[in-house]
Structures are given as C-alpha cells and as structure tokens.
Amino acid sequence: MARRPRNSRAWHFVLSAARRDADARAVALAGSTNWGYDSDGQHSDSDSDPEYSTLPPSIPSAVPVTGESFCDCAGQSEASFCSSLHSAHRGRDCRCGEEDEYFDWVWDDLNKSSATLLSCDNRKVSFHMEYSCGTAAIRGTKELGEGQHFWEIKMTSPVYGTDMMVGIGTSDVDLDKYRHTFCSLLGRDEDSWGLSYTGLLHHKGDKTSFSSRFGQGSIIGVHLDTWHGTLTFFKNRKCIGVAATKLQNKRFYPMVCSTAARSSMKVTRSCASATSLQYLCCHRLRQLRPDSGDTLEGLPLPPGLKQVLHNKLGWVLSMSCSRRKAPVSDPQAATSAHPSSREPRPCQRKRCRRT
C-alpha cells in the first residue's frame, strides 16, 4: 500500500469525516442523541499531528465506563443512558469518599490548560466546558519532594473519549502542548507517568496493561514514596500495584488530563508526611492488619496516642496494602492505540510492600 504524505491537509478532512461517522454510530449504540463528548472528529490545526495516522477510534471509546464506582449512589452508573452529558451528572453530587477537610495541595490556577475551569475551592477541575478540540491538563499547587505523598482523585463525570488520566510529571511537562490534539498526554515522554481510564500505564511513549478500567465514581489513589522511590496506584482504595521505581531525589507534581467534553475530576484527599519511624510503624501495622476497618482497634495504645496517629497518619492506617489479582487487559483499549507504537505488554509490577 502506498504511503500517504504526512502533511496532507486533504487526508485530515477525510479522516475527520470518518471519525465523525464512527462517533455517530457510537452515540446511536449508547442510546444518546445529544452527546457533547470528545469526538476525535474535531479538526486539529496541527498538520504534522501523528495522531492522524491512526484509524478511526473504536466505538466503545465514546461510551462511558460504568460499574466501576467507589459507591452505589444513584447516578454513578447511569451516564451512558442519559440523553445529555450535562444532565448525566447535574444534581447528583455524590460525596462518598470525601471525608477529609484539610488538603496539602489543590489544583493550580496558574499552571493549567486554557480549556479548564476550577471550582470547590480549586479542588475540582472541569475540562472542555462546551466541546473538546484537544487535550487539557492541570497540575497541583505543590511540588512533591522528600517524604511520603498520597492523594485521591474522584471521577465526578462520565469517563470516556480518547483518554482521561491520573499521574505525575515534572515541571518540564507542557500542559497546553496538545490543546489541539487528542492524545494520552501523561506518559508521552520521560518526564511523566500516567494511568489511563482504559487501564493502560503510560511512560516514555510506551503503554503497558496495568489495571482494569475506571469510570464515573471511581476513586484513584496515588502514593509517591520518595524514600523507596516508588509510585503506587490504588483504585477504590484497593492497591493496584507499583507503577514506577527508582524515583529517589526527583521532584514531581500531581497531574491529570482529559480529552472528554464536560468531564471533571476532584481532589478528595491530598496528604504528606515525613518518612519517620512513626510513619514506618503505622505502615507496617497496616500491612499486618490489611482487612481491619480500624487498624489501631484492639491494640494496647493510649487513647490520646491513637487520636494523634489518626490525625497525622490516618491515610496510612486506611491504605490497602494487599494487591489484587492482575486483571485481563482490555483488548478494545489495546486496539485503539497508535499502530506504530509498541503493543501493550504485561506489566511486571511489584507487590505493595515495604521492607
């Protein structure tokens, strides 16, 4: 087959039409007539955009992921059957998993893409308020240096489209670089790591099968341990696995990105602690009692000490340290990847344990 010219604008419009047709079929299957979702048929201004060398995205990418919510609240699994994306989450403000009142950091209003809007004291970020023409991203207000850092991101809207991701990145990541390109922004280079809602882990442009998919209502936890140099992901407060190692002496920002129109995410927890003997003891206690609702319950400790530990290290005492069985990779997510990129391979993950 003859190879088409890379910079042909005619091909851009041909592929745009094909993508619009694929998206229209996807909406018909989803039972929706007025979706404002991230359609890869939106035209990009980039002539040399490598994303246009792919085939039209698979139909399921336009259908929100359901059945992966942290709770059973009404509205967390109905998005794909609503007639409008706006009505899908209007009036259904679920607060499950949002117990914390103090936050170590929130989203940074000065370091974000133009297609983002902050609310809820800068803890909630909304992407592409009307329609989407690319990828929007944002980072936290605090650079994460030495110590233990843990945060949770709740998916507060339908999760669908080219990609919605949670991860970390250095200050070198350009958050507005792909504002006219639909892509998986986090993990495209060596400066960032990103977990996609499809279950793929991205880093240096490589993709590995890492977890099951997540959707509206899912809570994605991230633990950056600069003492051991590890990055660990959690889903609905269950450990998925260690995504990266050898991260000592590096500094990162928490980041998220989305290509989906009218999508949103919310910081429900952001904590930090020094790597002290107190932290290591609490972490070890949690490992020894992984299924206990209250790790300190029944232990011969003074009530005052228990309260202090809960206030300072409650996130450690509630953290799941047992790794779930690795799920089977989603073949639909793999087929929508860039054909010239490497195929997703099984991720060799370490157990969520500390020595």
From Swiss-Prot:
GO terms for molecular function: ubiquitin-like ligase-substrate adaptor activity. Its main location: nucleus. SUPFAM superfamilies: Concanavalin A-like lectins/glucanases. Residues 85-274 form the B30.2/SPRY domain. Residues 37-56, 327-355 are annotated as: Disordered. It is found in: Nucleus. It holds the Pfam family SPRY. Residues 264-315 form the SOCS box domain. SMART domains: SOCS_box, SPRY. One of its GO terms (cellular component) is cytosol. It comes from the Eukaryota. Belongs to the SPSB family. The SOCS box domain mediates the interaction with the Elongin BC complex, an adapter module in different E3 ubiquitin ligase complexes. This is SPRY domain-containing SOCS box protein 3.
